[in-house]
From Swiss-Prot:
Encoding gene per record: HSPA8
Protein family (similarity comment): Belongs to the heat shock protein 70 family.
SUPFAM superfamilies linked to this entry: Actin-like ATPase domain, Heat shock protein 70kD (HSP70), C-terminal subdomain, Heat shock protein 70kD (HSP70), peptide-binding domain
Subunit comment: Component of the chaperone-assisted selective autophagy (CASA) complex consisting of BAG3, HSPA8/HSC70, HSPB8 and STUB1/CHIP. Identified in a IGF2BP1-dependent mRNP granule complex containing untranslated mRNAs. Interacts with PACRG. Interacts with HSPH1/HSP105. Interacts with IRAK1BP1 and BAG1. Interacts with DNAJC7. Interacts with DNAJB12 (via J domain). Interacts with DNAJB14 (via J domain). Interacts (via C-terminus) with the E3 ligase STUB1 forming a 210 kDa complex of one STUB1 and two HSPA8 molecules.
Binding site for ADP: T14, Y15, G202, E268, K271, S275, G339
Location(s) in or outside the cell: Cytoplasm; Melanosome; Nucleus, Nucleolus; Cell membrane
Reactions catalysed: ATP + H2O = ADP + phosphate + H(+)
Gene3D superfamilies reported in the protein's UniProt record: 1.20.1270.10, 3.30.30.30, 3.30.420.40, Actin, Chain A, domain 4, Substrate Binding Domain Of DNAk, Chain A, domain 1
Domain comment (free text): The N-terminal nucleotide binding domain (NBD) (also known as the ATPase domain) is responsible for binding and hydrolyzing ATP. The C-terminal substrate-binding domain (SBD) (also known as peptide-binding domain) binds to the client/substrate proteins. The two domains are allosterically coupled so that, when ATP is bound to the NBD, the SBD binds relatively weakly to clients. When ADP is bound in the NBD, a conformational change enhances the affinity of the SBD for client proteins.
Organism name: Cricetulus griseus (Chinese hamster)
Keyword Metal-binding found: no
Single GO MF annotation: hydrolase activity
Protein name per the record: Heat shock cognate 71 kDa protein
Stretches with biased composition (Gly residues): 616-632
Primary site of residence: cytoplasm
Length: 646
């Protein structure tokens, strides 16, 4: 295949989306199910691996081996409080591998464990394939988005996931920044505008304030809640109905995973309905112990169940305004991103907060991020279209970065919301006489003391010549590149001795070897998936050939054209094959093909004889036998082929 353009991928917590900039505009690409967003789900079964819709659709039958929310694990340590609290809610198992979380599943009858990067890489591979199927070209270059909140290690791990998926990640950009680009292209204005981006997705909530002037974006502030989104609203509804079921039927379904999962799917559907209708009905047959569950919910009740969560979305809005040092009257535009911003109550709360100001909903909220990422991908890969030419992107660091100085004080070198790439240098000295070395501990966070902030990594600079305290000069440099990856170095001015760290190590970064290995494994899994597809198609081919052949010889139009002995011979062989198939559903492709050849050996001579004696097609059937497809041509192409539906 020829090389395709660069794409933009919104790798979401619950759903992902891919877009491409071509012919002067962005196209959001639908997957094979016709959906423009794809669930960030990967499932493992006894026979195959499923990604996307196919994985999400079977989650009720296979909850412990269906992995989602990898984005909540990526770039985190196992003992991270977030990981520990999230684990309680996941049906799949998360295990501790040398301090790093891995998800453990059963695949083809064996226990397998995967790093979050590997799971995310599977979703990215799916998005890459969706783009390739649409473009008819191979896709390697991509811009991938992350929440503004992501720290360094989460960004790096996301980039690694891209590498494992066989992508060249041109840049990692913030989701709100991407949405701003999508927006900036649509509305070119001369004067400076302050834009607030309100992004409420399936699992995360981000508020960002940007200024846009003459095609230049600057991010002024970011705030949000990494744990608020559509799923939380679903949960409130689920709990409401569990309680209702308890009241009416005196049964507690909460311990039954499958029942809860079916209820949740129905609730998600009802929630979507409530964005356009004032009430929705829920009908689930035999939800629990044979009891049907038929009920309904009004929009008002849904809003009441989520009242605190909905209202709570305004707190980060206020915080972002404070950080940007802006009053709400100074915001020119409010942009809605994320499917949950379709909820009328949320739109109303936001509109009232901004004193009745109109909200921008012109961009499909599910697609805005991928849209902007696609534009950015075009810019970075040198698209010369005037639509993207004069767009420049300035991203920021989400948290302040600094080092610990005497007494556990956080000394900030790079303030939060500093535009990146950036480089800051500051000179430090020793704290005691003849001190031989210094420990440089790098932290991120806004608190005055390092113990309240997050340790990113540390290293020692040793070999400082003996000197009284305060004499040695140690120059510390913080350097953040365009992807938000941080390098910290320290140099002793007297000796020129240097040591440095790329902040990633202590967060459980994957090593080069790990990534190489995972790339190979990803290839292997992909090959296995292909093999599985081939196997299924040769099985289907054999099955349809046997059934069609049976139907053909039993057709009354052939009565008298075929002698009973031949007919019986074919029927016996077909029945033998059909019963073999029932017992050998999981046989290898070669076995299915062998069985088909055996069957053809019996059938072909008889069918050929039939033609010759009939002098052409029997019963005026120029197109072949009824139900028999075209005359068998041997191999996997015999019998009508049915397109697989994943």
């Amino acid at each position: 295949m020829s090389k395709g353009p660069a794409v933009g991928i919104d790798l979401g917590t619950t759903y992902s989306c891919v877009g491409v900039f071509q012919h002067g505009k962005v196209e959001i690409i639908a997957n094979d199910q016709g959906n423009r967003t794809t669930p960030s789900y990967v499932a493992f079964t006894d026979t195959e691996r499923l990604i996307g819709d196919a994985a999400k659709n079977q989650v009720a039958m296979n909850p412990t081996n269906t992995v989602f929310d990898a984005k909540r694990l990526i770039g985190r340590r196992f003992d991270d409080a977030v990981v520990q609290s999230d684990m309680k809610h996941w049906p799949f198992m998360v295990v501790n591998d040398a301090g790093r979380p891995k998800v453990q599943v059963e695949y083809k009858g064996e226990a397998k464990s995967f790093y979050p990067e590997e799971v995310s890489s599977m979703v990215l591979t799916k998005m890459k394939e969706i783009a390739e199927a649409y473009l008819g070209k191979t896709v390697t270059n991509a811009v991938v988005t992350v929440p503004a909140y992501f720290n360094d290690s989460q960004r790096q791990a996301t980039k690694d996931a891209g590498t494992i998926a066989g992508l060249n990640v041109l840049r990692i950009i913030n989701e709100p920044t991407a949405a701003a680009i999508a927006y900036g292209l649509d509305k070119k204005v001369g004067a400076e505008r302050n834009v607030l981006i309100f992004d409420l997705g399936g699992g995360t909530f981000d508020v960002s304030i940007l200024t846009i002037e003459d095609g230049i974006f600057e991010v002024k502030s970011t705030a949000g809640d990494t744990h608020l989104g559509g799923e939380d609203f679903d949960n409130r509804m689920v709990n409401h109905f569990i309680a209702e079921f308890k009241r009416n039927d005196k049964k507690d379904i909460s311990e039954n995973k499958r029942a809860v999962r079916r209820l949740r799917t129905a609730c998600e559907r009802a929630k979507r309905t409530l964005s356009s209708s004032t009430q929705a009905s829920i009908e689930i047959d035999s939800l629990y112990e044979g009891i049907d569950f038929y009920t309904s919910i009004t929009r008002a009740r849904f809003e009441e169940l989520n009242a605190d969560l909905f209202r709570g979305t305004l707190d980060p809005v206020e915080k972002a305004l404070r950080d940007a040092k802006l009053d709400k009257s100074q915001i020119h535009d409010i942009v809605l991103v994320g499917g949950s911003t379709r909820i009328p109550k949320i739109q109303k709360l936001l509109q009232d907060f901004f004193n009745g100001k109109e909200l921008n909903k012109s961009i499909n909220p599910d697609e805005a991020v991928a849209y902007g990422a696609a534009v950015q991908a075009a810019i970075l890969s040198g698209d010369k279209s005037e639509n993207v030419q004069d767009l420049l992107l300035l991203d920021v660091t989400p948290l302040s970065l600094g080092i610990e100085t005497a007494g556990g004080v956080m000394t900030v070198l790079i303030k939060r919301n500093t535009t990146i790439p950036t480089k800051q240098t500051q000179t430090f000295t020793t704290y005691s006489d003849n001190q031989p070395g210094v420990l440089i501990q790098v932290y991120e966070g806004e608190r005055a003391m390092t113990k309240d902030n997050n340790l990113l990594g540390k290293f020692e600079l040793t070999g400082i010549p003996p000197a009284p305290r305060g004499v040695p000069q140690i120059e510390v440099t913080f350097d953040i590149d365009a992807n938000g990856i941080l390098n910290v170095s320290a140099v002793d001015k007297s000796t020129g001795k240097e040591n440095k760290i790329t902040i990633t190590n202590d967060k459980g970064r994957l090593s080069k070897e790990d990534i190489e290995r995972m790339v190979q494994e990803a290839e292997k899994y992909k090959a296995e998936d292909e093999k599985q597809r081939d196997k299924v198609s040769s099985k289907n081919s054999l099955e349809s050939y046997a059934f069609n052949m049976k139907a053909t010889v039993e057709d009354e139009k052939l009565q008298g054209k075929i002698n009973d002995e031949d007919k019986q011979k074919i029927l016996d062989k077909c029945n033998e094959i059909i019963s073999w198939l029932d017992k050998n559903q999981t046989a290898e492709k070669e076995e299915f093909e062998h069985q088909q050849k055996e069957l053809e050996k019996v059938c072909n001579p008889i069918i050929t004889k039939l033609y010759q004696s009939a002098g052409g097609m029997p019963g005026g059937m120029p197109g072949g036998f009824p139900g028999g497809g075209a005359p068998p041509s041997g191999g996997a192409s015999s019998g009508p082929t049915i397109e697989e539906v994943d």
